[in-house]
C-alpha cells in the first residue's frame, strides 16, 4: 500500500468533513512509534474480581494434559457459554512452564480470545495469562479476516481459513527439527446442525491428540459422547469430558455470562486505541471519538489497492462508496498462500475514514505500523462495522461519514447502517457469547 502522511491540517483540509460543533476542541494525538516485531501498547488490565475458583474436574484435566510429554494438540469443544475460553486459558498457563511457548489457534470469530471480532488467528504465547476473566489483545503470528461474527454465512470460507492456519502451524512449529510446540484449539459454541458438521470437519482435519468435551446440565445442547467424528481406521485421541463450571455464587463463580455484543464493541474499541501512544488517557468512548476524529489518516490511492467483498456482491461503480465508514481487513496478495482456496493473510484492521472519488483517494485509520502497511494491497470488507458506542458520542461529529460521497450515500444512511451493526446483533449460539470468564 503506497501511502503518504501529510500534516494534520493539510489532511483534514483535504477531507471536507462535516463542520464540528462549536463546543468541540482540537485534540491532536501522536501516533505510536513501534517496530514491526514489537507488540502493540498493552491495554491496562481490568480490575480483578473475586477469587477464581477452579472446578476439581478442570484441575484434574489440565494436570493430565500437562503431564503429556509429547507436545499435545488439544481441541476444546462444547456448547455456547460452557467455559471453553476460560478452560483454554487455564490450560495455556499449565503448559507454559513445561514448554516455554504454546500455540493457540482461535477459531471463534464472534468471541475471539486474543484478536478483534471477525478474525481467526494463530498465536504463539510465551507468557502466562494473569486475568482469567477478561481476554486481552495479543499480536498474532498469523491472522485471517473472515469478516463476520458468525460462520453461518460462509462455512466454506471459514473452514478454509481455519485449515490454512493449522497447516501453517504444523509446517512451522511441528515439522522435524522444529520446537514441536503444543497447540490449543479453541472452538465456537455452535454445535448443532451445520455447526456440528463444521466441528466434525475441524476434528477430522486437525486430528488432535486430546479432545476436551465440556458438557452442560442441558443435555439437548451437548455434543454426543465419545469420538463421534471418527469413521473408523483413524488414530483414536484421548477424550476428556468435564462439566461446565457452576454459577451458583457470583463471589465464587468460575463463569459469568456477559453480553456478547457489548464485549465485541469493547474489543474493537481497545483495538483502535492502539492508534495512540500508551501514555495517552482514553478512558471513555467520548475521548476515543475525539481522538479518532483528530488523528491524521493515511492517504491511499485507489490504484494501489483492490477491494474484496467477503460476504456480498457490489457493482463495480459502487465499490469505493461501499467501503466508506467501514472497518476493513488489511491484507497482501503477495503473502497469499498458493492453495486451491487462497485466503490472504491479514496484518490488521483499519477504519476507512473517508473517500475522495474525484481525487481517487481513500483515507484510512489503523494501528498497523508503516512497515507492515508497505505490502498491503487488499482491503477486505466484511460485516464488521464501527462500534456504535463511538458513533453515538454526543457533541462529536463522526469523522467516518465523509461528505465526499454524500451524493451516493448520505451521512444519515451510514449512521442508520451502523446502528444495525452485526456487533449489536443478538447472539445466535455459534460463538461463546458472553464469554466464559472466570
Segments and roles (model prediction):
Residues 171-233:
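Phosphate/Mg2+-binding loops and adjacent switch elements
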Residues 63-64, 91-94, 164-172, 201-202:
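A generic secondary-structure signal
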Residues 53-56, 61, 69-74, 103-183, ...:
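Nucleotide-state-sensitive switch-loop elements of NTP-binding domains
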Residues 86:
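Conserved Walker
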Residues 1-72, 76, 90, 94, ...:
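Preference for solvent-exposed, low-hydrophobicity sequence contexts
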Residues 98, 118, 206-207, 235:
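Short, structured coil segments at secondary-structure junctions
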Residues 83:
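Conserved glycine(s) of the Walker
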Residues 80:
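The conserved Walker
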Amino acid at each position: 500500500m503506497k501511502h503518504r502522511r501529510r500534516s494534520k491540517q493539510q489532511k483534514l483540509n483535504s477531507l471536507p468533513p462535516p463542520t464540528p460543533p462549536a463546543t468541540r476542541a482540537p485534540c491532536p494525538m501522536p501516533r505510536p512509534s513501534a517496530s514491526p516485531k514489537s507488540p502493540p501498547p498493552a491495554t491496562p488490565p481490568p480490575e480483578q474480581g473475586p477469587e477464581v475458583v477452579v472446578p476439581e474436574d478442570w484441575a484434574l484435566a489440565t494436570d493430565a494434559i500437562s503431564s503429556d510429554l509429547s507436545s499435545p494438540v488439544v481441541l476444546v469443544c462444547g456448547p455456547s457459554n460452557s467455559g471453553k475460553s476460560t478452560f483454554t486459558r487455564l490450560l495455556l498457563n499449565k503448559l507454559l512452564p513445561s514448554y516455554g511457548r504454546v500455540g493457540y489457534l482461535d477459531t471463534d470469530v464472534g468471541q475471539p480470545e486474543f484478536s478483534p471480532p471477525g478474525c481467526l488467528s494463530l498465536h504463539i504465547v510465551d507468557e502466562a495469562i494473569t486475568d482469567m476473566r477478561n481476554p486481552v489483545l495479543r499480536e498474532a503470528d498469523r491472522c485471517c479476516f473472515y469478516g463476520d461474527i458468525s460462520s453461518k454465512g460462509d462455512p466454506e470460507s471459514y473452514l478454509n481459513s481455519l485449515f490454512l492456519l493449522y497447516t501453517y502451524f504444523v509446517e512451522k512449529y511441528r515439522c522435524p527439527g522444529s520446537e514441536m510446540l503444543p497447540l490449543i484449539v479453541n472452538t465456537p459454541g455452535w454445535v448443532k446442525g451445520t455447526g456440528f458438521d463444521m466441528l466434525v470437519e475441524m476434528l477430522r482435519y486437525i486430528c488432535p491428540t486430546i479432545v476436551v468435551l465440556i458438557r452442560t446440565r442441558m443435555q439437548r445442547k451437548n455434543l454426543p459422547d465419545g469420538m463421534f467424528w471418527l469413521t473408523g481406521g483413524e488414530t483414536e485421541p484421548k477424550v476428556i469430558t468435564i462439566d461446565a463450571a457452576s454459577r451458583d455464587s457470583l463471589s465464587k463463580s468460575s463463569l459469568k455470562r456477559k453480553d456478547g455484543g457489548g464485549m465485541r464493541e469493547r474489543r474493537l474499541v481497545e483495538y483502535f486505541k492502539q492508534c495512540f501512544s500508551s501514555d495517552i488517557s482514553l478512558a471513555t468512548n467520548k475521548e476515543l471519538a475525539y481522538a479518532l476524529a483528530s488523528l491524521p489518516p493515511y492517504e491511499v490511492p485507489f490504484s494501489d489497492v483492490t477491494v474484496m467483498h467477503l460476504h456480498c456482491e457490489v457493482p463495480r461503480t459502487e465499490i469505493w462508496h461501499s467501503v466508506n465508514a467501514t472497518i476493513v481487513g488489511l491484507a497482501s496478495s503477495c503473502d497469499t498462500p498458493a492453495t486451491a482456496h487462497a485466503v490472504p493473510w491479514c496484518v490488521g484492521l483499519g477504519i476507512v475514514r473517508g473517500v475522495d472519488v474525484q481525487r481517487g483517494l481513500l483515507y484510512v485509520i489503523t494501528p498497523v505500523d508503516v512497515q507492515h502497511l508497505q505490502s498491503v494491497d487488499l482491503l477486505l470488507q466484511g460485516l464488521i462495522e464501527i462500534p456504535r458506542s463511538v458513533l453515538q458520542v454526543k457533541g462529536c461529529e463522526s469523522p467516518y461519514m465523509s461528505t465526499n460521497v454524500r451524493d451516493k450515500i448520505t451521512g444519515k444512511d451510514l449512521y442508520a447502517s451502523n446502528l444495525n451493526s452485526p456487533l449489536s446483533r443478538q447472539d445466535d449460539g455459534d460463538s461463546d457469547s458472553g464469554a466464559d470468564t472466570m
